Design a protein with these regions (language model features):
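Short beta-strand->loop structural element characteristic of the AMP-binding/adenylate-forming
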Residues: 2-46, 82-85, 134-140
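AMP-binding/adenylate-forming
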Residues: 44-52, 85-164, 176, 200
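Gly/Ser/Thr-rich phosphate-binding loop
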Residues: 164-218, 223-225
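AMP-binding/adenylate-forming catalytic core of the ANL superfamily
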Residues: 236, 261-347
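Conserved pre-ATP/AMP-binding loop-to-beta segment of ANL
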Residues: 7-8, 58-73, 80, 103-109
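Conserved ATP/PPi-binding loop(s) of AMP-dependent carboxylate-activating enzymes
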Residues: 218, 227-254, 274, 286
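AMP-binding/adenylate-forming catalytic domain of the ANL superfamily
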Residues: 344-365
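Flexible, low-complexity linker/hinge segments
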Residues: 1, 36-40, 46-68, 94-95
C-alpha cells in the first residue's frame, strides 16, 4: 500500500491507473495540505507500507499490505480515521455504470476539482481513464477557471455550485454537473437549472465507490431498500470489501447498512438525513435533515444546517445555523412559524445562529463537529 501524499496531477493519476490494472500497489491518496498531526494519525491508523511525497518514497516499518486497489481515508464528520478498501472491480463497476447513465462517450473530458483523497475526486480519475482521456485537474477551486476548463463533465459539491452561480460563471458549459457530497437546497438546483445547467444529483459514500444513486434512481446493478430501522441499505458490485485493519462489518446478508435514513416511493430514493443526526428533544425525535430541507426553502435563507445541542430542560434542542440571503437578517420567530406550517411544532428550531458561511470539511460536507460545538 502506497500512501500518496501528493497534489492532484499526472503522478497521482498514473498511480491510480496502475492500481486498477494490478500493475502497481494499492494506493491511499492523502492531501498534502493535511496538518502534520492529522497526517501522522492517519498513517498510524492505516499503516501503509510506503509513503510517497514529492521528496521521494519512504518505507514504513510496520506497514500492512492490502488486496484492494484504492483505500480512502474517511472519518466522516465525527470520528477517527477509517480506511475504506475498494477493489478494482468495485471502482470500475461504479465508473462504468455512471458513464452509461450519463451517456458519456469515449474521448469525453472530466474536470477534477475535488480532492482525489476523497472518493468523489478519485472517481473522476477512474471515469477519465475509462473515457481514454487525461483528467483536467484544478488543485484550487476558481469558478471562472472551472467554467473555462473545456471539460464535458464535472463533479461538484453544493458549495462550489453556489460559488459558480454567485460569480456568474457559465454552468451551462458542461454536458453534466454531478452534484453530491451534501444535500443541495432545492432553490440552488432550481437556480442552476434555470441558468442552463444539466444537474444530476448523486447519493453514495466511500463505501459504495461514490455516487450509486443518481437523481434518486440506483445505477444499473445497484439495489436499494429501507430496513425496519429506517436506514438505507445498498447492494451491488460497487460495495467496498471492508475497513482496513478493522473487524467492523456493516453488512446484513450482502447489504451495506448505511447511517442514512430514507424512503422509497415509485422506485425513487429520498434521503431524509443521517440516523446519528436524529435530535431527541423533550422525548420527540426530529430528523435534522428534514428540518434543514424545509428551512432552506425560506426566502431569506441562503444555506442552513440543523443540529442538536444539549439543553438542561429538553435534553437536546434543535438549532438552525443559517447563512442569510443577501444582507437581510432572519429571526427565530420567522423560522419557527415557517417550519410549523410544514412540520409538527416540536420539530421547529428553538434557536437560530446567523453565520457568514457554513464551516466545511475538505470534502465539501458541513463540519458537524464544529457546528454542534459552537458556543
Amino acid at each position: 500500500v502506497h500512501a500518496l501524499v501528493l497534489p492532484p496531477g499526472p503522478a497521482l493519476s498514473e498511480a491510480v491507473r496502475h492500481a486498477l490494472t494490478g500493475e502497481g500497489p494499492a494506493v491511499l491518496p492523502l492531501s498534502p495540505d493535511l496538518p502534520r498531526p492529522a497526517l501522522a494519525a492517519t498513517l498510524a491508523a492505516l499503516r501503509p507500507t510506503h509513503v510517497v511525497t514529492q521528496d521521494g518514497v519512504r518505507r514504513e516499518p510496520d506497514g500492512e499490505p492490502s488486496d484492494a486497489a484504492l483505500i480512502i481515508a474517511t472519518s466522516g464528520s465525527t470520528g477517527a480515521p477509517k480506511g475504506v478498501e475498494l477493489t478494482a472491480e468495485a471502482l470500475l463497476a461504479s465508473a462504468r455504470a455512471s458513464l452509461a447513465r450519463l451517456g458519456a462517450r469515449e474521448g469525453d473530458r472530466w474536470l477534477c476539482c475535488l480532492p482525489p483523497s476523497h472518493i468523489s475526486g478519485a472517481q473522476v480519475l477512474v471515469r477519465s481513464l475509462l473515457c481514454g482521456t487525461e483528467p483536467i485537474v484544478h488543485s484550487r477551486f476558481s469558478p471562472e477557471e472551472v467554467a473555462a476548463s473545456g471539460a464535458d463533465h464535472v463533479s461538484l459539491v453544493p458549495t462550489q455550485l453556489r460559488r459558480m452561480l454567485d460569480a456568474g460563471a457559465g454552468v451551462a458549459a458542461f454536458r453534466t454537473i454531478l452534484l453530491g457530497g451534501a444535500a443541495a437546497p432545492p432553490g440552488l438546483l432550481a437556480e442552476a437549472r434555470a441558468a442552463g445547467a444539466r444537474i444530476v444529483t448523486t447519493y453514495g459514500s466511500s463505501e459504495t465507490s461514490g455516487g450509486c444513486v443518481y437523481d434518486g434512481v440506483p445505477l444499473d446493478g445497484v439495489e436499494v431498500k429501507i430496513g425496519g430501522d429506517g436506514r438505507v441499505r445498498i447492494a451491488g458490485p460497487v460495495l467496498f470489501s471492508g475497513y482496513r485493519l478493522r473487524d467492523e462489518r456493516p453488512f446484513e446478508g450482502g447489504w451495506f447498512v448505511t447511517s442514512d435514513l430514507g424512503s422509497i416511493e415509485d422506485g425513487r430514493l429520498t434521503v431524509l438525513g443521517r440516523a446519528d443526526d436524529v435530535i431527541n428533544t423533550g422525548g420527540r425525535k426530529v430528523v435534522a435533515g428534514v428540518v434543514a430541507e424545509v428551512l432552506a426553502a425560506h426566502p431569506a435563507v441562503r444555506d442552513v444546517v440543523v443540529v442538536g445541542r444539549p439543553d438542561p430542560e429538553w435534553g437536546e434542542i434543535t438549532v438552525a445555523v443559517v447563512v442569510p440571503r443577501d444582507t437581510r437578517e432572519v429571526t427565530l420567530d420567522e423560522l419557527r412559524d415557517f417550519a410549523k406550517e410544514r412540520l409538527p411544532a416540536y420539530a421547529a428550531p428553538r434557536a437560530v445562529e446567523l453565520v457568514s458561511q457554513i464551516p466545511l470539511l475538505p470534502n465539501g460536507k458541513p463540519d458537524m463537529v464544529a457546528l454542534k460545538n459552537r458556543n
